[in-house]
Amino acid sequence: GVIGTYYASEAGFEKNIADVCKDHYAPLGPSDEVPNSPISIVVALADKIDTLTSFWAINEKPTGSKDPFALRRSALGLIRIIIENDIRISLSDILALGNDGADIEDLKYFIHQRMKVFLRDQSLRHDLIDACLSLDKGDDLALLVKKSFALMDFIETSDGSNLIQGFKRANNILLQAEQNDGVEYSYGADPKYAEEEAERNLFYALDNEEVKIRSALEKENFVEAMNSMANLRTPIDIFFETVQINSDVDITRRNR
């Protein structure tokens, strides 16, 4: 690649074209710099996508410690190029472009596992990555990383702790009720069945914070969105402390 760059320069090619000869191999290791010029990025990604999809198409995958075709390195290179250049692109779409009969979902899973290893070295917890992966199937790697780091920073704050405790309290009651009633409470509650002031206040808080949460998510301000969710802890606590969940009236109990 380096020699190719020299030859291309001597042949009169522009520098950004000549540099592609060496840049499309990058990064060769976890500490190597990634390509950052548009042409080099495109060719480097295409090279790695072609390598991965081609080997997946013939069912040649890394097993254990064996990786004779350096596919883990190709996957890590693809991940780093996307993340470090903040490229907003669908992983499924770009893998489909190079698909020669490869199992795209299996290849995505492999790439996600490599990304977990890469991010673990940056002190990001696996369970946080898994939580973010569950939301949108991890198609946008750059966005996934932003969400994961925002979540990690948030849960270490008092607001984060409040949010988790509020969720646990509500979720435990729901799980127990679903088990006892044999139904799934996935539908929303209806304000018209709210009898107590704490119930009505909780509905108001939910509606109020939902507007803020949606706005924050549209701006990809995930910390702001989670702060708004954490604001629900107080009305949730008051609801649990002052309202009898297990009402004698069945429709009221189910709504609560």
Predicted regions and their residues:
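Amphipathic alpha-helical "coupling" segments that flank catalytic cores
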Residues: 1-256
